[in-house]
């Protein structure tokens, strides 16, 4: 199994295969609308705007597993992200990132990420960096601001 073997539903219900992102550098992030880290949407959007033409994709996956910080419907979450942070990168339907019902993509990402930040997702805005070949290169903690990832992203572009 690799990153490209998975699929997920976009906010509009469309099934998207991760193979659509072959040859791109990808950030996968679990998001929440009512979290202290929610302002990271702004930094993620800035990265996306600055590097999408060079092959960066950011995939947002809302999750309500951390103190119900994304309890809204998918349509409400999507509208919140667009209106408050101008998010233009792809947002997917709400998923679970931990437990038996964790989305298969997140089961894979947690298994593939090595080092101190492997295993269970501890909070919203955990970010996974994937290279152009679909390898999980790094897992960034929720407190890591998107701009702090820029150097690693540039190395892969």
Curated annotation (Swiss-Prot):
Official protein name in the record: Glutathione peroxidase
EC number: 1.11.1.9
PANTHER family, alphabetized: GLUTATHIONE PEROXIDASE
Entry similarity comment: Belongs to the glutathione peroxidase family.
GO biological process, one term: cellular response to oxidative stress
Entry annotated with the keyword Manganese: no
Keywords per UniProt: Oxidoreductase, Peroxidase
Active site residues according to the UniProt entry: 35
Catalytic activity: 2 glutathione + H2O2 = glutathione disulfide + 2 H2O
Pfam families, sorted: GSHPx
Molecular functions (GO terms): glutathione peroxidase activity
